[in-house]
Structures are given as structure tokens and as C-alpha cells.
Amino acid sequence: MKTVTVKNLIIGEGMPKIIVSLMGRDINSVKAEALAYREATFDILEWRVDHFMDIASTQSVLTAARVIRDAMPDIPLLFTFRSAKEGGEQTITTQHYLTLNRAAIDSGLVDMIDLELFTGDADVKATVDYAHAHNVYVVMSNHDFHQTPSAEEMVLRLRKMQALGADIPKIAVMPQSKHDVLTLLTATLEMQQHYADRPVITMSMAKEGVISRLAGEVFGSAATFGAVKQASAPGQIAVNDLRSVLMILHNA
């Protein structure tokens, strides 16, 4: 299986990489969070752009991206606008969603973008090609905050992401029972053993799904999300606690 290397970080080998999300609502809070996060230990910084209030102005978004990059020049930066339909904070048109992602790619400030699978195949493929032409990696994602699809359906979605050119397919689902958590882990293992030729990220959310955020190295998830301050999704745990558990499992 091939790995993804971003700023000397190798995703897809060894311990799952820890991603934390920055969720400032304006330039000042973005800067304050970025400076505060320098004290934490993690591998990838995700900027959740949907929390930023001035998304109507592409220039304001890029100014904030520059602030983050200046604060942490050596950390891989993932640009993510999470749509409202997949659990995000704001609703925007598909066209503006694509415009923001292309502007981020053009800026040279971000290393990766998050691109939602169900944006539309043609737009997704065009954006993937555009990102790759500018040496930007694509995390292609799907989130279900209401349920856990069947293992077969989750594998199909991850395989479709792979077929559309995702560098890292990602799926996050909400369990309604402990069996749902096992379904997510089953899908992850199935993908890893039979279909994946690149790193994959999976998680089951909320308290019941926490085990999936810890056991990625066992079942085949290459990264996991932790919280420095505020969690960006249900079930995230503090980065220091997360790293301790990941190290225990890695060294066992």
C-alpha cells in the first residue's frame, strides 16, 4: 500500500496520525487558536473553514489561512469546509464551496483539502485533478451524523473515493448501538485487507464510537481526530490522552 508524505509526515505507516481542528470564527480568534495550538503535540492541523464567519470573502479566507500558516509553518495544513448537510456550521452553494477549495489550492498555503464525496462526481474529479496539478493532496470524505450504513455500503463509498482519485478516503458515521461500531470496524478491516491501495481514515462517532478512534492501527485507519480545546465532532478525546493510548497499542 502506498503512503502519503506531507511535510516529512508519512501517513499510512506506523501509529495513526493525530489531527486536530482549528475552529476560530474570525481572524483574531483564528490567530489566537493557532498560536495556542503550537503548545500541543499533534501531526496535522485541520482548519474548519465552516466555523469562519467571513466565508463570503475569499480574500478574508485566504488571509486567515496565511495567519495559520505563519503561526505553524511546519505542520501539514488540511483545509476543510464541512457542509451543513454533513454536520458543518454553514450552508453555502456548491459553486462557492468549489471556489473556496480552488482558492485554497491556488494559494500555496495548504497541503491538503477535504473534498466531500457527494459534491457531484464531475466537480469532485475536476477538483481532484486541479489539486494534484498544484501538489495538494485530497482527503475525500463522507459523514453521516444520523446512522451507520451497512459495512458493504461504507466499503463501496470508500472504494468510490479511491476511484475518483482521493489520496486519503475518509468516512465518519454515527452509531446507534455497539453493533454499529463493530460494523464500522468491519468495513475498515475489509477495506484495508481487500481494496485499499492508499491510507484510509474511518471513525465511529460519539461516546460509543471512541474505541474506533483509538484502534486505527489494528483495523486499518491511518489517522484519528483529537481535541486541543473544543471537539469538532462527538467522541473526540484530548490529544495527550489520545497519543498515550495510540502509543500503548503501537508498542504492544
UniProtKB/Swiss-Prot annotation:
The entry's function note states: Involved in the third step of the chorismate pathway, which leads to the biosynthesis of aromatic amino acids. Catalyzes the cis-dehydration of 3-dehydroquinate (DHQ) and introduces the first double bond of the aromatic ring to yield 3-dehydroshikimate. The reaction involves the formation of an imine intermediate between the keto group of 3-dehydroquinate and the epsilon-amino group of Lys-170 at the active site.
What is known about regulation of its activity? Inhibited by (2R)-2-methyl-3-dehydroquinic acid.
Its GO biological process terms?
A: 3,4-dihydroxybenzoate biosynthetic process; amino acid biosynthetic process; aromatic amino acid family biosynthetic process; chorismate biosynthetic process
Active site at 143, 170
Q: Which reaction does it catalyse?
A: 3-dehydroquinate = 3-dehydroshikimate + H2O
Q: Which protein, by its recorded name, is this?
A: 3-dehydroquinate dehydratase
Q: Which PANTHER family does the record cross-reference, listed alphabetically?
A: 3-DEHYDROQUINATE DEHYDRATASE (PTHR43699:SF1)
PROSITE patterns hit by this protein: DEHYDROQUINASE_I
**By its UniProt entry, which InterPro entries does this protein fall under?**
3-dehydroquinate_DH_AS, Aldolase_TIM, DHquinase_I, Type-I_3-dehydroquinase
Provide any one GO MF term from the record. Answer: 3-dehydroquinate dehydratase activity
Identify the pathway. Answer: Metabolic intermediate biosynthesis; chorismate biosynthesis; chorismate from D-erythrose 4-phosphate and phosphoenolpyruvate: step 3/7
Task: Give the intrachain disulfide bonds.
Answer: none
Native source organism of the sequence: Salmonella typhi
Q: Does the keyword Amino-acid biosynthesis apply?
A: yes
How this chain assembles, per its entry, is: Dimer of dimers.
**Binding positions (3-dehydroquinate):** 21, 46-48, 82, 213, 232, 236
Give the EC number(s) under which this enzyme is classified. Answer: 4.2.1.10
User: Is NADP a UniProt keyword of this protein?
Assistant: no
The entry's keywords: Amino-acid biosynthesis, Aromatic amino acid biosynthesis, Lyase, Schiff base
